[in-house]
């Protein structure tokens, strides 16, 4: 039996200055299977041997010519490597709840600056790339505290604001403006004939998401073939 994946693309127009009931969301459902992918491409690369151990990062991100790894549980969680020189430039961001510390950080999808979401404190930090990759403890350019807590998962940039996984029964996601204020619930859980309690619904359709940073969102539900 062929397995199908339902791609749920949500096209949205965001107005963060005045969030009203006029905000609309257009849904388009597409069903595809593996044989629909007609073009195959091979990827090739080269091995870079750095002068320091990479350890076991849970996340990696490229910023210009720098590879930044996130090692949750290490004394300093972000390690910076120069791809051109294969040299480790330094480490930064210690574990903690101080103003320059983080507990459970994750990268936000930006390439013009370094944006990091601390899940434990529901706080978004923004740094300039030169500042973050300097090899010293960076000074953040902005620090945004989300007004709806906690968000125990992914945050993605969308328009002038952010979209995060809610872990609430009302909707799988929350939209926030650039100040961290929640503007609306986003999306709906898949319909099913089985009845769930709120906790069962959240666990049955645990979500993760990604965006193109502009107007398109893809939400995937763990333990299903739904996107």
What positions do the PLM features span?
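C-terminal motif of bacterial Sec signal peptides marking the signal peptidase cleavage site
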Residues: 15-18
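A short helix->beta-strand "capping" segment at the edge of beta-propeller domains
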Residues: 28-55
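Beta-propeller fold detector
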Residues: 41-46, 87-96, 134-146, 183-191
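Beta-strand-rich domains and repeat architectures in extracellular enzymes and scaffolds
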Residues: 45-77
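Structural signature of eukaryotic scaffold interfaces centered on beta-propeller domains
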Residues: 56-63, 105-110, 152-158, 201-214
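Short loop/turn segments that connect beta-strands within beta-propeller blades
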Residues: 83-85, 129-132, 177-181
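Blade-loop segments of beta-propeller domains
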Residues: 87-121, 141-146
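Asp-box/WD-like beta-propeller blade repeats and closely related beta-sheet repeat scaffolds
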Residues: 120-123, 127-161, 166
């Amino acid at each position: 039996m062929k397995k199908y994946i339902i791609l749920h693309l949500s096209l949205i127009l965001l107005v963060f200055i005045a969030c009203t009931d006029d905000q609309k969301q257009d849904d388009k459902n597409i069903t595809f299977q593996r044989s629909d992918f007609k073009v195959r491409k091979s990827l090739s690369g080269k091995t870079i041997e750095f002068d320091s151990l990479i350890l076991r990062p849970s996340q990696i991100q490229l910023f210009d010519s720098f590879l930044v790894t996130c090692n949750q549980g290490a004394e300093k969680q972000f390690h910076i490597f120069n791809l051109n020189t294969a040299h480790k430039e330094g480490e930064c961001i210690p574990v903690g709840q101080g103003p320059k510390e983080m507990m459970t950080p994750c990268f936000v999808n930006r390439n013009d600056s370094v944006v990091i979401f601390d899940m434990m404190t529901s706080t978004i930090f923004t740094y300039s790339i030169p500042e973050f990759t300097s090899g010293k403890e960076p000074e953040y350019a902005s620090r945004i505290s989300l007004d709806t807590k906690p968000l125990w998962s992914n945050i993605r940039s969308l328009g002038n604001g952010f979209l995060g996984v809610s872990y609430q029964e009302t909707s799988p996601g929350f939209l926030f403006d650039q100040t961290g204020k929640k503007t609306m619930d986003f999306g709906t859980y898949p319909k099913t004939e089985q009845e769930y309690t709120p906790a069962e619904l959240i666990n049955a359709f645990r979500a993760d998401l990604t965006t193109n940073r502009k107007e398109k969102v893809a939400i995937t539900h763990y333990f299903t073939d739904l996107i």
